[in-house]
Swiss-Prot record:
GO terms for biological process: apoptotic process; chiasma assembly; ectopic germ cell programmed cell death; fertilization; male gonad development; male meiosis chromosome segregation; male meiotic nuclear division; meiotic gene conversion. This is Testis-expressed protein 11. Represent the only meiosis-specific factor encoded by the chromosome X in mouse. Interacts with SYCP2. Interacts with PBXIP1; may prevent interaction between PBXIP1 and ESR2. Interacts with SHOC1. Interacts with REDIC1. Pfam families: SPO22 (PF08631). It comes from Mus musculus. It is found in: Chromosome.
Amino acid sequence: MDRITDFYFLDFRESVKTLIITGNSWRLQEMIDRFFTNISNFNRESLTEIQNIQIEEIAVNLWNWAVTKRVELSVRKNQAAKLCYIACKLVYMHGISVSSEEAIQRQILMNIKTGKEWLYTGNAQIADEFFQAAMTDLERLYVRLMQSCYTEANVCVYKMIVEKGIFHVLSYQAESAVAQGDFKKASMCVLRCKDMLMRLPNMTKYLHVLCYNLGIEASKRNKYKESSFWLGQSYEIGKMDRRSVEPQMLAKTLRLLATIYLNCGGEAYYTKAFIAILIANKEHLHPAGLFLKMRILMKGNSCNEELLEAAKEILYLAMPLEFYLSIIQFLIDNKRESVGFRFLRIISDNFKSPEDRKRILLFYIDTLLQKDQDMIAEEKIKDVLKGYQTRSRLSRDLVNWLHNILWGKASRSVKVQKYADALHWYSYSLKLYEYDKADLDLIKLKRNMVSCYLSLKQLDKAKEAIAEVEQKDPTHVFTRYYIFKIAIMEGDAFRALQVVSALKKSLMDGESEDRGLIEAGVSTLTILSLSIDFALENGQQFVAERALEYLCQLSKDPKEVLGGLKCLMRIILPQAFHMPESEYKKKEMGRLWNYLNTALLKFSEYFNEAPSTLDYMVNDANWFRKIAWNLAVQSEKDLEAMKNFFMVSYKLSLFCPLDQGLLIAQKTCLLVAAAVDLDRGRKAPTICEQNMLLRTALEQIKKCKKVWNLLKKTGDFSGDDCGVLLLLYEFEVKTKTNDPSLSRFVDSVWKMPDLECRTLETMALLAMDKPAYYPTIAHKAMKKLLLMYRKQEPVDVLKYSVCMHNLIKLLVADEVWNISLYPLKEVQSHFKNTLSIIRQNEGYPEEEIVWLMIKSWNIGILMSSKNKYISAERWAAMALDFLGHLSTLKTSYEAKVNLLYANLMEILDKKTDLRSTEMTEQLRALIVPPEDQGSVSSTNVAAQNHL
């Protein structure tokens, strides 16, 4: 084992050399992972032939390569961490002597570096292992240094070296503890570092920043109490050395601390927040600090005077006008309008330039409109427009701001359905455009006005406005939408369809969408959806149908497509259900089938894409499944359509949760579909088409068998014929297609313990139904059937007679004059059994007795022609036995049969050569032509009747 380990290590050593020499090998990641996995297999005892110096050399080379080449060779962080891990483990192998303080210091450095690599790759537990090793090495270093020093000065220097190392390790352990959620350990490490700052003052800023960053991370995770601790420590540590930590940084820390206290809520935290912001503003006055002070005062429900005084403090900072306006907006938004307006008057005295005064006036107008003080605002607007028209023109950005103010007010009016008010405010914006002669957003303004006119049912004004818009921006999606709405309101379906077609074309051509509309969540498809809603609301179903078809065709959103298909089907279904049978109804049903298939396709594409969509997908699948079922029921006069709808219903059911009701529906769908394809297969004009239909039926039968097996586990279905029907359907398909598995299938059927008579009856018929021809199967089925009939009490002589007739007809053909082809012993046994049944039961059909009598007589004649005298006499005597059981027909046959019997006996008594031509003719004269009065219907008809 040791030699195997040596071999692995030698291979490892060569690989390290190769890695260092070749640099970025294409197998770099594979090699690093292999080294990392195998390092645990190496220990000092196993490496008997490797010297310590060699191991140490490999470790140092690998370390240096990992550190220096990481950036150059794009070694990922986790790979670099693994390389450092390997190097450290090699250095720490048992038995390697630490000969100097430099060696221990190198180990400390390697441990700290490796721990940091693992910490920053997200594996804090491995990092802790190396930090602890570094701490142990620091203790060893301290002992070694104390043993080797001889002066007090040296002792101080050595202590400083060790303490600095301990400080760094503790800080990294704190970060690791935070990463693992161990706040207690992290805080203990930081407090130990804080205690060491008196001896390490140059580390103050480092620890201050560390605590600040830990506070930010805790606040991101909503751990406000932990965050407040770290930020508090950051401020206290920063105060310890004001030369290294600037007042701006201390103030920033306190502002964040105040914000954290504010988020905690409660009176106590409010007080702490207020104290923190006061100290922050004292450390370094900043607009953010003054603004935060106002927020805290607002939170504490301070009086208006306190708020105003806090606002006035900001004036000393000489900030831009926009900053002061944001303060006023903040006050107004928090229901302190009186303070806001008072402060607005104060700043208006401080900003005396014409541009600033105009900006303050527009802000005042906007504020008045937000607070619904419309009359005062309107007077100010008129003053602005009058001044703008005569002498005091506004700059471009102020003009745009005024437009935005007016449009904002109009938009708020539209939201509460005050369309006349909205038009009123839009009219001021229109006047401003007239004065300005600019055409920046005039088209958009006109469209907004069209929307209001339409809502007010003012069609003439809407048409006049949209005509101007159409001239300048005819392809804009909202231009088309308003033209569409006007057409619908006027009942112009042709014009509305033109717009819908234009929307479809723009979608198919991939015309670029307006960026502003996209950001607002409006697209051409959205407008198409709105057009559909508007058409339906106004009774234009034909237009809505066309638009819905385009939507389903072009949308990529499965929810939107399914919604469109549901809407389409809700429109068409009532009409289709009440239509008389016609080509038009057939066409409409075809449309519905296409819609269902489109829905099925969407379910197949998107059902498993996102779990969040599952609920609505399941509900929609169930809805479409039921619709397909109802359409199948409606199509009972068109078997192919009925089958198609049932199959779609089945496929849609696969996206619904299974229960007993759903399994019953699936069973019915597949059973009916198989029956329809079987029926069509029987009537198919060509063998090729027949085989195709029968194979399709077989696929459906197999699926139905699986469903049936699941369904039987959910309850008692002993009265359900599904199992029998599936057996017969599968048998018919296999016989008609000459399936090679038929033999195995039939063998399994014979072994079934609960075969019913009607199943065997149908199997016997189907086995001989063209193109099937399996007399052996029919023979066995009828034998089993006769046995079952005989066991019944009382015997059903009618069914028995039919089965016996068919069996004898199968065994003894009328036209074959060859005794060797008949199983006469079996036939004779069946005849005897029949005579026994006739004797013991009443009601055996006389026509069948006559038929058996004639068949027995003719077999006797056949036997005599072959010089089988005894057998001939026996068969003839059996014919007389059948004659004896006749009643009403006895008189018709008795004389003739007795005469024939006497003639036969005379011929047999002479014992002449029956094979002579003369004698053959005499025997043929004795044959009675069969009177097949008891024949049954064809197997094909029987099979159809069974379906």
